[in-house]
Amino acid sequence: MAITKGNKIVLVGTGAVGSSYAYALMNQGISDELILVDLNEEKAKGDVLDLNHSIVYAPSPMEIKFGSYEDCKDAALVVICAGAAQKPGETRLDLVHKNVGIFESIVGNIMKSGFNGIFLVATNPVDILAYATWKFSGLPKERVIGSGTVLDTARFRYLLGEEMNAAPTSVHGYIIGEHGDSQLPVWSSATIAGTPIAPRLTDEKKQEIAENVRDAAYKIIEAKGATYYGIATGLARITRAILKNENVVLPVGTLLEGENGHDDVYIGVPAIINREGVRQVVELSLNDEEKEKFARSVETLKDIQAAIWS
C-alpha cells in the first residue's frame, strides 16, 4: 500500500512539548489539519480552543480539533510526545522502562486504525522509543523517525555562533549519537564559511562547549521544570522537511544498517529527509577519536535495547 499523502498530522500527547509543537506548526503554516489526542481530554480540548483563537493571526488557515486514535487512519504524520515526564536529576535513560510499556499501547492503537504514514517520535529516551515504535509498528525503518540530535545540534550551533560572533545559521556542525549523556560533537567537520572551527578553539573551550550542550537539558529542567521550546521547534523543522518533500539533511534518529560500521540501533545521525521519511543516512567522515566515542554511544543504547528485547 502506498504511503498516505496529504498533510494531516495527529499529535499524541499535549503536554509542554506537544502543545509547544502544535503552536509552532500553526505559526509556521506547515499543515492545514491537526488532531490532538491525549488521555487528559480537558487539557487537550483547552489547547484546541486556545490554538483556534490564534489562527486569525497565523500565516495560513488550519483546522485544529480534538480526536482519537481512529483519526490516525488517514494521517500523513503521527507525532508522539506522550509519556512519563523526566524528573530533576533523572537521566533520559532512567525513563526507558516506564515509557516502552506506554508506547506499546500507543503504537498498537495507532496501527489498529489503519495508519500508513510516518511516525515522528519525541518522547525520551527518544532513541530507544523510536526503536520501540519501529518494532511495535512493523513499518519500514525509513517511516519511523526519532527527533535524534536535532536539538543537541541546535544547541551546538548556537554556542559556536556565540563563540565565533556569527549567526548560528551560518555555522555547520553536528552532534551525533544518543540524545543524552553519550552524545558527541563532530569537531572534525564543524565549519563556518567553509573554514574549520576546531583549530580556532582551545581544547578547553571545545570541552566546555561539548559539556554545555550535553548538560543543557539538566540546567533547563532544574530552572523551569522541563524543556519544550527548542525541541518543539526542532520537531516542526523535521515536519516541514517531511511534508514539503525538502530532501534536506537533518540530524534525526534513524535505524543504522551498516552505516559507520553499526547496525540495529536507532541513533542520531545526519540524514536526508523527504516525503518518504528518511531517504538516506549521510555518513560523516569521523576521525579515530570520534569513531570511538560514537561506538560507545551505540553500545550505550544497545545495552538498553538488549535489556528490554532480549
Curated annotation (Swiss-Prot):
Modified residues (Phosphotyrosine): 218
Chain sites annotated for binding substrate: 86, 92, 124-127, 152-155, 227
Residues that hold NAD(+) according to the record: 17, 38, 43, 69, 83-84, 105, 122-124, 147
Places the protein is found: Cytoplasm
Residues the record marks as active site: 179
Reaction(s) the record says it catalyses: (S)-lactate + NAD(+) = pyruvate + NADH + H(+)
Name of this chain's protein: L-lactate dehydrogenase
Organism name: Halalkalibacterium halodurans (strain ATCC BAA-125 / DSM 18197 / FERM 7344 / JCM 9153 / C-125)
